Amino acid sequence: EYETMDMKKLEKWLSTVEKSCTVFLCGASNSSGLTLRALQILHQNGVKMDIVYFVPEVEVLSEEKTLNERAVRGVLQNYARSGLFEKICLVSNLRLEEIAGSTNVFDYYSQINRVFTSSYYMMDVFKNTKPITSTFKRPKESCRITTIGLGSLEKDDLMFFPCNQEVEVVYYYGINEEKLKTEENLFRTITNKVKSRITDETKVSFGIYPTQ
């Protein structure tokens, strides 16, 4: 369908995007083909792009949508590996539902989307805030396929997409400022948590941020 659209109008609108942008999409949506074309135009315009890709439950999709989703996801991952994007973040709707806990039909997508948006927002805040201390390293050029998740010092991490091979893990610890000032051995607790995730194949870094 997108091939019949007025591409000149699309190109004109995309020309207003400068420097960088983040694109959110799902391969099962009817607009995914148009989005792929838009990404090509943005790349030609020299725009740096991050992609957030929502993976649906393909088992319940129609055959047509299943094939479309797999094709779009494969194209995006190849684009990411080739450097067309800065990175692609994979997010599973099923994982979001599991983390959200109790959901209802009427508010289902709002409830699972809230899990993602609140987490993504805080990550953006932390990335643009100077940490109290950090061990952040420059990410490898090859690490372009990513995901995010939630974690705590007491529990296992809850990832938004299953990762078969973790090359780099980055923790952003948002901790109450008063707790940072008063809790004894907290830095050691954080360091031990990080060290427990390090392997020969996985490098781990972290930053600590005060919250109210």
Predicted regions and their residues:
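Tubulin/FtsZ superfamily GTPase core signature
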Residues: 1-212
